[in-house]
A protein has these predicted regions:
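Catalytic core of nucleotide-activated saccharide and alditol-phosphate transferases
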Residues: 1-75, 181
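A generic structural motif
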Residues: 1-3, 81-88, 155, 177
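Residue-level detector of flexible, active-site-proximal loop/helix-junction positions
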Residues: 26, 39, 61, 88, ...
Length: 192
């Protein structure tokens, strides 16, 4: 975190570095190149059986109340939730285990921290693993992979149909759109 972002970013630019961000508001505010959040295509096949409906894993980061509210709402609708919320990062699970848990679920939960607009990795993970997504990030509607059949905006969409949303099949996203979020595409952006 920069103490004086405008001044600090200017100093970094003067060193010859190209700056980019995955947050569209930061890109506009600080005149930085906007780039998509990225992910590496899964190299191994993960289990296909589903053992839970909704999955969240992450630190609470001032989101605990919203996470608990969402979990209760989902469970009251008859959905099985797997929420892993460690107290510290050291108490968390490994990333391979995280991906395994994600693969065992129908839907990924993505609750952004306040003032965050850019995508977290969860929407891109959901995209690559063909999972539904429940998010509170209303800005997700502007992304090319957005499809209301796959992405439920918590706080905007009606909660009446959330169970049907989670249980309905994922609508396939075209491969050419997925490629835009692959790390190799991101790297190509920076190659001369």
């Amino acid at each position: 975190t920069f103490k004086n972002p405008s001044k600090d970013l200017k100093a970094i630019r003067q060193l010859g570095y190209e700056l980019s961000t995955f947050d569209p508001q930061d890109a506009e505010q600080y005149d930085i190149t906007f780039t998509n959040q990225y992910f590496r295509y899964p190299s191994e096949k993960l289990p296909e059986q589903v053992t839970s409906d909704c999955f969240f894993c992450g630190l609470a980061k001032n989101r605990m109340e919203e996470l608990q509210t969402l979990k209760e709402l989902l469970e009251n609708k008859g959905l099985k939730c797997n929420f892993i919320i460690p107290n510290t990062a050291k108490e968390g699970i490994s990333y391979p285990e995280y991906l395994r848990q994600l693969s065992l679920s129908r839907c990924v939960i993505d609750i952004n921290q306040s003032n965050q607009v850019g995508l977290t990795r969860r929407p891109v993970e959901a995209l690559f693993y063909n999972k539904k997504l429940i998010t509170n990030n209303t800005d997700i509607r502007r992304y090319d992979f957005y499809n209301p059949k796959n992405i439920f905006i918590f706080g905007k969409n009606s909660l009446e149909g959330i169970k049907e949303f989670v249980e309905s099949p994922v609508t396939e996203v075209p491969e050419q759109i997925r490629q835009r979020y692959d790390i190799n595409t991101w790297i190509e952006h920076y190659l001369p």
